[in-house]
Amino acid sequence: MLSDKGKYASATENRRFVWQEIIWPLILEINDVSFSLKQYQKKRDQVCEVKGVEASTTSRGLVSLLQKGILFKENALYSIHYRLIAYMRLKADCNYATAIHEVRMSG
């Protein structure tokens, strides 16, 4: 997916892909601010099959979203940042750029 990019561009692209193709659609689908690892894995597998992407690429993106503060992990659940809840309630598009902007505005 990202072989010809530098390390930082590759990490950003992994985060962007995981957020826009897996996490945000999952959040809208389940209509909840949190999801389990099992729910994530099911959605990831569906997306990876359709897009032809390795699951290992998406795991790096998930960890990176945790490090950026867009996602939080508590016990067995992953949750979105509180500033993104309004987007979920409105069923609005929340791309990676919007998500990172909202998270940075809070801190």
Say what each PLM segment does:
Residues 32-46:
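Short acidic, hydrophobic short linear motifs in intrinsically disordered regions
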